[in-house]
Amino acid sequence: MTKATKEQKSLVKNRGAELVVDCLVEQGVTHVFGIPGAKIDAVFDALQDKGPEIIVARHEQNAAFMAQAVGRLTGKPGVVLVTSGPGASNLATGLLTANTEGDPVVALAGNVIRADRLKRTHQSLDNAALFQPITKYSVEVQDVKNIPEAVTNAFRIASAGQAGAAFVSFPQDVVNEVTNTKNVRAVAAPKLGPAADDAISAAIAKIQTAKLPVVLVGMKGGRPEAIKAVRKLLKKVQLPFVETYQAAGTLSRDLEDQYFGRIGLFRNQPGDLLLEQADVVLTIGYDPIEYDPKFWNINGDRTIIHLDEIIADIDHAYQPDLELIGDIPSTINHIEHDAVKVEFAEREQKILSDLKQYMHEGEQVPADWKSDRAHPLEIVKELRNAVDDHVTVTCDIGSHAIWMSRYFRSYEPLTLMISNGMQTLGVALPWAIGASLVKPGEKVVSVSGDGGFLFSAMELETAVRLKAPIVHIVWNDSTYDMVAFQQLKKYNRTSAVDFGNIDIVKYAESFGATGLRVESPDQLADVLRQGMNAEGPVIIDVPVDYSDNINLASDKLPKEFGELMKTKAL
């Protein structure tokens, strides 16, 4: 190629829309979720020629949830693309959820032409201002030449440190403008090293001199890139541990003896009492958004070792004695495991033994249970039996989420996905769609209540169109029960929680999905098996009896439960 030809090629002109797509290709994006509109249709048009694949959703919020699932499962930003006005504003809940829960997402939206931005005109909105409080990065591109810089920085910022959402707005005339601006390359994020040696040595000393050191694994500690190192530490040092809801999957089958369940939302679990008895707590990748430290360090007297990529968010109940700041697996691997000797005295051994027994008892369906509807623990048990350890299960928010989060064992990272930062209704089905694209051909299970189901049930059409192998289980009781049982506890009555019943089987069939119903608890295993063996999307209606829900928020700590364990353990 001659010099003149090279210069001519370097001056090839493209629309801004094509430059946006070139940026996505450079970042390795495989899917873009969204809904088109006039202010952004130039980008959708360019995607037709260059990729990535467009996944048309039925609501922008759900498109953001799908992108969030991709971000959580891959560690790379999922991408959502929408138009101006309500197209952009409908992203708010999805981006807030992703940003709060540490999931990388890049959202791109159209806007009115620059000349109309300050006018009271159709769909004019200060997009960047709208998303500034709920994202890590929110900008509007005012010059076509800045597109590569804005998009590339959005990807970098969404993934860096505490991952989250980034937003870029494009006025219509900017994406339609022609330019010879070159793209910029994707720049890999710098990799952190381990924490400082002296901090690691000090942490080892505190653990070795503790009477009952406990590991609290948070969401970053339970992610695929950290899990091998975390499990190795737990196995070598034989420390008891608990998971937050979003760290589900830290547990492996050979760590069952050291595992004391998950903690979150209500302070009444075996893991809560374990932390109550601990004198040293090592937190790994823990974020206070998962479970406020005031619930597990109520007196503020625990010795806390904070191991994370970012500094601790200081709180009256969270003032670490040591901070091990660095790459999580590198820091853990830098610990000389064989040098850490932990031996529990008879008192502590008794505490652990009694807690294990209490934990086991709490996982059983009551012996005197009688109902023509399934007990929550029956559903959890049969679902666990129906799926292998690598099946991704996405969980909506509601009473069912508490039962799933506490009792559904997860043995691989990110195989139980839950929204515990914002507790956003409607995430399960869109997340399952995103997961099915990350893991093509693999069965995905999603779980919701009948309340949360209708927040995003329109995406069943998306699942059918994609022939996604999703089994969605609806725990059906015609009530916003997570609100109801808390109202009963506070006021001895409920208000504004009841709604009408729908025929979930017919709803599924109207979209071209398979609809199944569990008519009695003894059918659970067979119906779940039938659903797992079916082709394409399946919706299973499971009538549930939530009579035991009133105990979910019981105040067992620090009084009754604490006294019970005190008499047993001491």
UniProtKB/Swiss-Prot annotation:
Mg(2+) binds at D450. Its EC number is 2.2.1.6. Thiamine diphosphate binds at E60. Binds 1 Mg(2+) ion per subunit. Pfam families: TPP_enzyme_C, TPP_enzyme_M, TPP_enzyme_N. Keywords: Acetoin biosynthesis, FAD, Flavoprotein, Magnesium, Metal-binding, Thiamine pyrophosphate, Transferase. The keyword Transferase applies. FAD binds at residues 162, 266-287, 308-327. CDD domains: TPP_ALS, TPP_PYR_POX_like. Its cofactor is Mg(2+); thiamine diphosphate. One of its GO terms (biological process) is acetoin biosynthetic process. Pathway: Polyol metabolism; (R,R)-butane-2,3-diol biosynthesis; (R,R)-butane-2,3-diol from pyruvate: step 1/3. It catalyses: 2 pyruvate + H(+) = (2S)-2-acetolactate + CO2. The keyword Mitochondrion does not apply. It is an enzyme of class 2 (transferase). Gene3D superfamilies: 3.40.50.970, TPP-binding domain. GO terms for molecular function: acetolactate synthase activity; flavin adenine dinucleotide binding; magnesium ion binding; thiamine pyrophosphate binding. GO terms for cellular component: acetolactate synthase complex. Residues 399-479 are annotated as: Thiamine pyrophosphate binding. Induction: Strongly induced under anaerobic conditions. Activated by ResDE, Fnr and ArfM. NCBIfam families: acolac_catab (TIGR02418), PRK08322.1 (NF006187), PRK08617.1 (NF006378). Belongs to the TPP enzyme family. This is Acetolactate synthase. The gene is alsS.
